[in-house]
From Swiss-Prot:
Its main location: plastid. Binds 2 [4Fe-4S] clusters. Cluster 2 is most probably the spectroscopically characterized electron acceptor FA and cluster 1 is most probably FB. It comes from Illicium oligandrum. The gene is psaC. The lineage of its organism: Eukaryota, Viridiplantae, Streptophyta, Embryophyta, Tracheophyta. One of its GO terms (biological process) is photosynthetic electron transport in photosystem I. It is a peripheral membrane protein. It is an enzyme of class 1 (oxidoreductase). Apoprotein for the two 4Fe-4S centers FA and FB of photosystem I (PSI); essential for photochemical activity. FB is the terminal electron acceptor of PSI, donating electrons to ferredoxin. The C-terminus interacts with PsaA/B/D and helps assemble the protein into the PSI complex. Required for binding of PsaD and PsaE to PSI. PSI is a plastocyanin-ferredoxin oxidoreductase, converting photonic excitation into a charge separation, which transfers an electron from the donor P700 chlorophyll pair to the spectroscopically characterized acceptors A0, A1, FX, FA and FB in turn. GO terms for molecular function: 4 iron, 4 sulfur cluster binding; electron transfer activity; metal ion binding; oxidoreductase activity. It is found in: Plastid, Chloroplast thylakoid membrane. The eukaryotic PSI reaction center is composed of at least 11 subunits. This is Photosystem I iron-sulfur center. GO terms for cellular component: chloroplast thylakoid membrane; photosystem I.
Length: 81
């Protein structure tokens, strides 16, 4: 199952998302495109389980996890109701 993590420029480098990820998908790397000069990309998206704990932990709404598999998206949407 593969998920994409959308990157915004509001990262403050607090590492809350990295610590919240149960599968250690995220890691901090240098990046000039945000205030903190470092960013938490998802180099191992195949390990992402789509729990969105990183989104919940982020104080600046930096991360957005999107599911790109049709089956997985429909299943996730069904869980919301």
């Amino acid at each position: 199952m593969s998920h994409s993590v959308k990157i915004y420029d509001t990262c403050i480098g607090c590492t809350q998302c990295v610590r919240a990820c149960p599968t250690d998908v995220l890691e901090m790397i240098p990046w000039d495109g945000c205030k903190a000069k470092q960013i938490a990309p998802a180099p191992r998206t195949e390990d992402c389980v789509g729990c969105k704990r990183c989104e919940s932990a982020c104080p600046t709404d930096f991360l957005s996890v999107r599911v790109y598999l049709w089956y997985e998206t429909t299943r996730s949407m069904g869980l919301a109701y």
